[in-house]
Amino acid sequence: MLIETRKLSKIYRVGVERIHALRSVDLNVGDNEMVAIMGSSGSGKSTLMNMIGCLDRPTSGTYLLDGHDVSRMGPAELAKVRNEQVGFVFQSFELLPRQDALQNVELPLIYSGSSKGWGSRRRRAREALARVGLSDRIRHRPNQLSGGQKQRVAIARAILNEPRILMADEPTGNLDSGTTTEILELFRQLHEEGQTVLIVTHEDEVAACCQRVIRLRDGEIASDKPVAEDIAGQSARGDQLSC
């Protein structure tokens, strides 16, 4: 199993108040799954993403990544896992405005202190941009790119180190419907090539493109179903979903 959590909990303290963001979450995700994590604001979906992506530590419980207990790792080990095992895609793209597409994609190799030379970094960044269909935009800066193109650059950056897990947090939130379809198709292509993909979303249309849908409520898993069963449940409530 690629991802395993056991009784994973996260409590934040705000003054004297204790906020239970996650409550004893048990979760398994296998290699090469494409999973949607859903829930309303405050449900715990972003907190769960932060735990899986090693951006935050649980208050209690265990998180195993490919059999390794991540919850017991120190800061240096966690940084290595984040850089090599997890790729992140965010709603706001998080691109450096003064750097072109190629330079933005190179960043994970630069920050990791990779021993690979300049030429090797450039080659890998070009290959990543080619995979997302942006070979003709490598010298464009973010302000010269459309929203969909910016997200493609962000995806290229996320897959540069060939991570085990690709995590996307509301990746279509700033995109129109046509561009959303294009980005979801790109995620499906990466999944078909063997990539494990986790998408945090509040949009049923995005979740419908995954294999499995996990819904959180009040920090707990309310449902965990194959997408066909989840869609059937949503349709029974009057929603029309398709991908």
Regions found by a protein language model. Give the residues of each.
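ABC family nucleotide-binding domain
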Residues: 2-216
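Conserved beta-strand-loop-alpha-helix hinge in the C-terminal portion
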Residues: 220-243
